[in-house]
């Protein structure tokens, strides 16, 4: 009889299942009211006295092993049921996860930074909430200067000397105040102007402005720098500089690139001329250098600026600037391949 019980012990040890029904069959077979353990205990009275001790030990071992097996497998099955209730069927194929992407403004900004970094320009940043000195006065725009009207400004009501910057030229002022020439830096960032929101303009937009200060810097140096940029950014090798006015540069110019007239869109955006304005530039006014603590008799330089949205609209052929700020997933997910 003892040998038979040992066979049952081996069977109980070897038992394994992931099925509740089979586990219940095992429990009934070994531990049920008519199971093996109970039947074997009923035979205890017929065992010779000299074998009762060994018989009792073996049958208790069978009972313990069967109970532990039922307990262990039950816990495993309950754990899997809990995981399944929390996470679903883990064997099912996963659902498609929408991958995010960089915003088109960030893509263009980073591309501009890379282009100018290749020729030695670093990146400088500054506060979006500025004071009058850094945004206007230091840039040759003293109080009551008529050129201030060129930029409709958001002032802080409780302190009119504080405002939302209208250009990133304020960053260049701060950079010149804290760094000695030679200076070669670009200042990308968000700017604010009190303008009507339309398909072509917005009260919030992004600029990148560049500054190069050194000895014997020429207008030709500026032109070659801008020509390099337009080749890298647009693949265009023809630019022109039209005379213009900016209070912080003298002489000043508008930057045009020859876009071409290959499509109907080209005719529309260039008004039939083939030329397209992308920004402004000029030689830094000596008064600006003096205001920033740089001696204009020793150093000179050039500055330029352009709108990042303007460039993004050209490259991605986007017709409405408002699309950059509406957070429409149908628009933004078109750029996910370029993250």
Swiss-Prot record:
GO terms for molecular function: ATP binding; magnesium ion binding; phenylalanine-tRNA ligase activity; tRNA binding. It is found in: Cytoplasm. The keyword Nucleotide-binding applies. GO terms for cellular component: cytoplasm. Binds 2 magnesium ions per tetramer. Pfam families: Phe_tRNA-synt_N, tRNA-synt_2d. It catalyses: tRNA(Phe) + L-phenylalanine + ATP = L-phenylalanyl-tRNA(Phe) + AMP + diphosphate + H(+). Disulfide bonds: none annotated. It comes from the Bacteria. One of its GO terms (biological process) is phenylalanyl-tRNA aminoacylation. Mg(2+) binds at residue 250. Its cofactor is Mg(2+). Keywords: Aminoacyl-tRNA synthetase, ATP-binding, Cytoplasm, Ligase, Magnesium, Metal-binding, Nucleotide-binding, Protein biosynthesis. The keyword tRNA processing does not apply. InterPro entries: aa-tRNA-synth_II (IPR006195), aa-tRNA-synth_II/BPL/LPL (IPR045864), Phe-tRNA-synth_IIc_asu (IPR004529), Phe-tRNA_ligase_II_N (IPR004188), Phe_tRNA_ligase_alpha1_bac (IPR022911), Phenylalanyl-tRNA_Synthase (IPR002319), tRNA-bd_arm (IPR010978). Its EC number is 6.1.1.20. Its main location: cytoplasm. PANTHER family: PHENYLALANINE--TRNA LIGASE, MITOCHONDRIAL, PHENYLALANYL-TRNA SYNTHETASE. Belongs to the class-II aminoacyl-tRNA synthetase family. Phe-tRNA synthetase alpha subunit type 1 subfamily. Tetramer of two alpha and two beta subunits. This is Phenylalanine--tRNA ligase alpha subunit. The gene is pheS.
């Amino acid at each position: 009889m003892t040998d038979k019980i040992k066979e049952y012990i081996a069977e109980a040890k070897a038992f394994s299942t992931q099925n509740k029904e089979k586990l219940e069959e095992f429990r009934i077979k070994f531990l049920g009211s008519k199971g093996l353990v109970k039947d074997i205990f009923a035979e205890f009275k017929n065992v010779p006295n000299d074998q009762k001790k060994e018989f009792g030990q073996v049958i208790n071992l069978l009972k313990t092993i069967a109970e532990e097996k039922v307990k262990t497998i039950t816990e495993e099955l309950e754990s899997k049921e809990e995981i399944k209730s929390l996470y679903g069927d883990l064997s099912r194929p996963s659902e498609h996860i929408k991958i995010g992407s960089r915003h088109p403004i960030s893509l263009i900004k980073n591309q501009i930074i890379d282009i100018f970094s290749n020729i030695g320009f670093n990146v400088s940043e500054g506060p979006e909430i500025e004071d009058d000195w850094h945004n206007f006065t230091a840039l040759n725009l003293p109080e009551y200067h008529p050129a201030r009207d060129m930029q409709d400004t958001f002032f802080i009501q409780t302190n009119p000397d504080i405002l939302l910057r209208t250009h990133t030229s304020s960053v260049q002022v701060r950079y010149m105040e804290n760094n000695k020439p030679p200076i070669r830096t670009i200042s990308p960032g968000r700017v604010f102007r009190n303008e009507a929101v339309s398909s072509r303009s917005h009260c919030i937009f992004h600029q990148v402005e560049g500054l190069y200060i050194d000895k014997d810097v020429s207008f030709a140096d500026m032109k070659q720098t801008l020509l390099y940029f337009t080749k890298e950014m647009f693949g265009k090798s023809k630019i022109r500089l039209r005379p213009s006015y900016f209070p912080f540069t003298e002489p000043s110019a508008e930057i045009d690139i020859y876009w071409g007239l290959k499509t109907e869109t080209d005719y529309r955006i260039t008004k039939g001329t083939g030329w397209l304005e992308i920004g402004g530039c000029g030689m830094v006014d000596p008064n600006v250098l003096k205001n920033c603590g740089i001696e204009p008799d020793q150093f000179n330089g050039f500055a330029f600026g352009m709108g990042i949205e303007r460039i993004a609209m050209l490259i991605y052929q986007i017709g409405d600037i408002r699309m950059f700020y509406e957070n429409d997933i149908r628009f933004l997910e078109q750029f996910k391949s370029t993250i």
